[in-house]
Design a protein with these regions (language model features):
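Cytochrome P450 heme-thiolate monooxygenase catalytic core
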Residues: 13-14, 33-206, 222
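Conserved cytochrome P450 K-helix E-x-x-R motif and the immediately C-terminal K′/meander segment
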Residues: 142, 236-278, 298
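Cytochrome P450 heme-binding "Cys pocket" and the immediately downstream C-terminal segment
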Residues: 217-219, 287, 339-377
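Conserved cytochrome P450 K-helix/beta-meander segment immediately N-terminal to the heme-binding cysteine loop
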Residues: 289-317
Length: 389
């Protein structure tokens, strides 16, 4: 068994120390605060302007890479101290995003056939997809390792430009501790975790939302009427408006429920023998909480296959949460980036629906909104006509 790295696929001391360090220092650098909100809003506005220029050239089909880059900027400015332009983009970053998007689409959270029949990587590495997946993961690892190397070359103790600098400082402080879990390999793994988990799920949330607004124009009308009344078409949105937008909140929650972007959590490992609800779970068993089964439970939701935001609206027209909605998991292993994901989803969707009307091309029947299976569920791709409001 190899060294446990990062926070997504580790447990025990490694997971506890790496997660605690990450949360504490990301908050110091602006994570979850007003600074982060301002960065997200700037990225959302830039993305809106980009879409406005893009839609002049015709229908928009796949916004995946551009949405991912726009969502990446807020997080990446804290992680490595720089941002990227949507128009030109950084070729290496764009290539890494494309590589990771393909890896996510071509695998699933259990590891697919390789997880159930691991010997296939030796007897049929090409047929099983092991060669292709391994190549993409290696390219992604090299991208982040190179970023750490560039930071080391210009790093000065005591000067904290970003998260990478803070982590390098921690490595230096613990270099004489043989039990330390802080090293460059761990840093690269953390960066990959932040990049993969935060970017893919959030960009998919935005794309699913725009997709549902496109195929459900009556719901789009209601959301835009609420936005016009509460914020206006030309005023800057902010998180302070969130509690005054019950219908939009209901729509965003319903998107997360029905799209099941993370159909399960990431794999967990049982660290001790235990019994749960009569089931015996042995030490080292892999446990996958099935979030989709909760979100699509017919007894609880009644009509889980229907996109119906009103299930989150009470008789007084107010938004009500439902404890059965757990897209970020629950407990101590809950998603590290939940706050960032929710804030980004909200501000991006508000900016887009303030400025644009989304509809299907004339004569096109509404497509299925069933997601594409992979490590996460990806929004379906279809032509969308985007017009300024």
């Amino acid at each position: 068994m190899g060294e446990k790295r990062g926070v997504m696929f580790s447990d025990g001391k490694v997971w506890f120390e790496q997660r605690r360090f990450s949360i504490r220092n990301l908050k110091v650098l602006g994570w979850g605060g007003q600074t982060m909100e301002q960065m997200i809003l700037e990225d959302a506005q830039n993305f809106t302007k980009f879409i406005e220029r893009k839609c002049k050239n015709g229908n928009i089909n796949n916004m995946k890479t551009f949405t991912s880059l726009a969502v990446l900027n807020s997080l990446w400015s804290i992680i490595k101290g720089s941002r990227y332009d949507l128009e030109s983009g950084d070729p290496k970053v764009m290539k890494t995003l494309e590589t990771m998007n393909r890896a996510v689409k071509n695998s699933n959270v259990t590891g697919g056939i390789l997880n159930h029949l691991p010997f296939l990587r030796h007897v049929a590495p090409k047929f099983s997809g092991y060669d292709e997946l391994n190549e993409r993961l290696n390219k992604t690892w090299i991208f982040f390792a190179d970023e750490v190397t560039r930071h080391k070359d210009s790093w000065q103790p005591g000067i904290r430009r970003d998260f990478i600098d803070v982590y390098l400082e921690e490595i230096e402080a613990r270099k004489n501790d043989p039990t330390s879990t802080f090293n460059e390999m761990q840093l690269v793994a953390l960066l990959k975790d932040f990049f993969a988990a935060g970017i893919d799920t959030t960009s998919n949330s935005i794309e699913f939302t725009i997709g549902y607004m496109t195929v459900c124009p009556d719901i789009q009308d209601k959301v835009q009427a609420e936005l016009d009344k509460v914020i206006g078409k030309d005023n800057l949105p902010s998180l302070a408006f969130r509690n005054s937008l019950p219908y939009l909140n209901a729509v965003l929650k319903e998107v997360l429920r029905i799209s099941n972007i993370g159909p399960t959590t990431i794999p967990h490992r049982a660290t001790v023998d235990s019994t749960f609800m009569g089931y015996e779970i042995k030490k080292n068993y892999t446990v996958l909480p099935n979030l989709m089964s909760v979100h699509m439970d017919k007894e609880h939701w009644g009509d889980p296959e229907a996109f119906r935001p009103e299930r989150f609206i009470d008789e007084h027209g107010e938004f009500v949460n439902d404890p059965w909605l757990i897209p970020f998991g629950s407990g101590r292993r809950k998603c590290l980036g939940e706050t960032l994901a929710k804030n980004t989803h909200f501000l991006f969707v508000v900016c887009l629906l303030q400025k644009f009307r989304f509809k299907l091309p004339n004569g096109q029947a509404p497509p299925s909104m069933l997601g594409k299976d992979g490590f996460t569920m990806s929004a379906p791709e279809f032509d969308i006509v985007v017009t300024p409001r």
